[in-house]
Design a protein with these regions (language model features):
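Carboxylate- and glycine-rich phosphate/diphosphate-binding segment that chelates Mg2+/Mn2+
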Residues: 1-59, 169
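Short alpha-helical scaffolding segments that buttress acidic/His motifs in well-ordered protein cores
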Residues: 1-2, 45-53, 83-86, 128, ...
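Alpha-helix N-cap/helix-start motif at coil-to-helix transitions, marked by capping-box chemistry
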Residues: 12-23, 80, 95-99, 122, ...
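Glycine-rich phosphate/pyrophosphate-binding beta-alpha loops
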Residues: 50-82, 162-164
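Active-site pocket-lining segment
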Residues: 76-140
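C-terminal charged capping/lid subdomain of soluble metabolic enzymes
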Residues: 112-186
Length: 186
């Protein structure tokens, strides 16, 4: 949902659903993951995921999904590959979409209303990274059998996802893509 909100194709329609989905997801994922019996949190996650799907139909996805697609070769689940790359792509994009991240932060975390745009953008990216940590998603692609010698393939295959990369707020060069993958190849 954050990816939808920061897409070049974002619209007021997709923003409405992305914000609603983000609010539900950010405020329920820890409880839904940590407490198998918390049906309210799980139902909120389900509704948040639905809202995210509606948002995607209006805004499309960006570099997060573009760089995740080549990881399917290694049988990494789509959601896991997105999660591994998400905060790194958002950090790369931050200077081009920090205002959008700040607006989303206002909708999801109103208690940060008095913070600066940069603080709000950093907080949103930090929350993404924290969710990956709390849900025990591996952050190193080598855990899935990806090797450093696969880097050139990943860079080329990621850069070939033009239909998604054109939605990204910031253009990615081959070197930019390489740097993002290097952050998750330890």
């Amino acid at each position: 949902v954050v990816e939808c909100f920061t897409s070049k194709k974002a619209t007021p329609f997709s923003d409405t659903y992305a914000t609603a989905g983000a609010k539900l997801i950010f405020h329920n994922i820890r409880e839904a993951y940590g407490d198998a019996d918390n049906m309210e949190a799980k139902n909120n996650m389900m509704l948040g995921a639905f809202y995210g799907g509606v948002a995607i139909t209006g805004s499309g996805t960006t570099a997060v999904h573009a760089l995740s697609y080549p990881l399917g070769k290694y049988h990494i689940a789509h959601g896991v590959s997105n999660a591994i790359l998400f905060a790194h792509v958002m950090e790369f994009n931050k200077d081009a979409c920090k205002e959008r991240l700040a607006v989303l932060c206002d909708g999801v975390f109103p208690e940060f209303a008095t913070k600066s745009v940069d603080e709000k953008a950093d907080y949103m990216i930090g929350q993404i990274a924290d969710i990956v940590k709390v849900t025990n998603i591996p952050t190193d692609l080598t855990e899935f059998g990806v090797k450093m010698e696969d880097l050139d393939f990943l860079v080329q295959a990621g850069s070939d996802q033009k239909r998604l990369l054109v939605n990204n707020m910031k253009e990615l060069s081959l070197d930019d893509i390489r740097e993002i993958y290097l952050k998750v190849l330890k």
